């Protein structure tokens, strides 16, 4: 029986590894549903990394298993293996291939981040519209005669803020909705500057460009919505995050930065409405925000005692009536 050439076995193994790797990379089911425009970009990058990782795993583990079986010590063998040392072509190969893979993934990841708006210097002006400015930035915008040229140059050279900014299709445009997000131990507070609404949940319309101005009141927190593939630390210098939700629904908001003993309980939710439902929610909550009813300590105490409003009115009338009999 004619022996199959080693090249045929190598080619067959390469085809099998390639097919398995591509199948695993596109059918893994490891990620939650996609609910934002940024999610497909992140998922595509993850699929590529998983495909490459699967191929490397199969090649390395397959080679180990093959050599363990084929070159195992057999019965009656007492000698040692040949003292082989060094193989320049092989060493160059297994150094060059990982280096090329790392370079490719690094360049591609930067491209993905830029398409999401992360490293686009043109977004600095849009960030400055809503984000708090430092003293140096204020000096740069309103220079006085006493400001030296060196100080002005330093202010003008202030680097752009980084983070998840505006994607290229909305670059230079104002967001449809701005929300101030404050993280504190152990809650998220969402404030809508245009309406004065303050909420413990994030409400946004589907299909609209949303900008979050992130801040932390105590320690560092990290705003994470898995379905949006959106994770941004609330730290100085990275104040804004922009995204666009694509599916109506309710999704968890998680703090992904260890922030204290109850870090695991720092959760809330983002509710994505249709534009009509969002306007209804905003009108209802704006009325409450413009005329808040804050009960006094006395009112809360009376309510806890079960005293009716009529009885309170009678007591107050007697107390303010000079003709009433004093006990």
From Swiss-Prot:
UniProt cross-references to CDD domains, sorted A to Z: CuRO_HCO_II_like_5
The record's Gene3D superfamilies line, in alphabetical order, gives:
1.10.287.90, Cupredoxins - blue copper proteins
Annotated GO biological process: ATP synthesis coupled electron transport
Binding-site residues, Cu cation: 221, 255, 259, 263
- Supply the Pfam families for this chain: COX2, COX2_TM
Q: Which PROSITE patterns match?
A: COX2 (PS00078), COX2_CUA (PS50857), COX2_TM (PS50999)
Q: Quick one: where is this thing mainly located? A: membrane
Give the record's GO CC terms: plasma membrane
* Reaction(s) the record says it catalyses: 4 Fe(II)-[cytochrome c] + O2 + 8 H(+)(in) = 4 Fe(III)-[cytochrome c] + 2 H2O + 4 H(+)(out)
Membrane-related topology note = Multi-pass membrane protein
Signal peptide range in chain numbering: 1-23
**Manner of cofactor binding, per the entry note:** Binds a copper A center.
| Cofactor(s) the protein requires to work | Cu cation
Q: Has UniProt tagged this entry with the keyword Transcription regulation? A: no
What is the annotated localization of this protein? Cell membrane
Q: Where are the transmembrane segments?
A: 56-78, 96-114
Q: Which GO terms describe its molecular function?
A: copper ion binding; cytochrome-c oxidase activity
Query: Which family does the entry's similarity section mention?
Result: Belongs to the cytochrome c oxidase subunit 2 family.
Q: What is this protein called?
A: Cytochrome c oxidase subunit 2
Q: Which gene encodes it?
A: ctaC
């Amino acid at each position: 029986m004619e022996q199959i050439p080693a090249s045929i076995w190598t080619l067959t193994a390469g085809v099998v590894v390639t097919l398995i790797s591509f199948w695993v990379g596109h059918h893994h089911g490891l990620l939650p549903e996609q609910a934002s425009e940024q999610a497909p970009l992140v998922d595509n990058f993850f699929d590529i990394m998983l495909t490459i990782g699967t191929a490397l795993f199969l090649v390395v583990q397959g080679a180990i298993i093959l050599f363990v079986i084929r070159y195992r010590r057999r019965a009656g063998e007492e000698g040692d293996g040949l003292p082989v040392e060094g193989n320049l072509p092989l060493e160059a190969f297994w150094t060059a291939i990982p280096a090329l893979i790392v370079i490719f993934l690094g360049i591609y990841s930067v491209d993905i981040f830029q398409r999401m708006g992360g490293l686009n210097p043109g977004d600095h002006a849009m960030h400055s519209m809503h984000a708090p400015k430092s003293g140096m930035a204020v000096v740069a915008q309103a220079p006085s005669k006493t400001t030296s040229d060196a100080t002005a140059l330093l202010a003008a050279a202030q680097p752009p803020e980084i983070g998840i900014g505006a994607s290229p299709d909305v670059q230079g445009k104002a967001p449809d909705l701005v929300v101030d997000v404050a993280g504190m131990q152990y809650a998220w507070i969402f404030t809508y500057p245009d309406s004065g609404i303050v909420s413990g949940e994030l409400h946004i319309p589907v299909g609209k460009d949303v900008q979050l101005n992130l801040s932390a009141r105590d320690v560092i927190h990290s705003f994470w919505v898995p379905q949006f593939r959106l994770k941004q630390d609330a730290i100085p210098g990275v104040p804004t995050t922009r995204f666009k939700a694509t599916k109506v629904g309710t999704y968890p908001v998680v703090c992904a930065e260890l922030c204290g003993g109850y870090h695991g309980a720092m959760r809330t939710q983002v509710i994505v409405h249709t534009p009509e439902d969002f306007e209804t929610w905003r009108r209802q909550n704006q009325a409450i925000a413009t005329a808040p009813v804050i009960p006094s300590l006395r009112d809360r105490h009376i309510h806890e005692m079960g005293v009716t409003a009529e009885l309170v009115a009678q007591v107050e009338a007697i107390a303010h009536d000079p003709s009433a009999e004093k006990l």
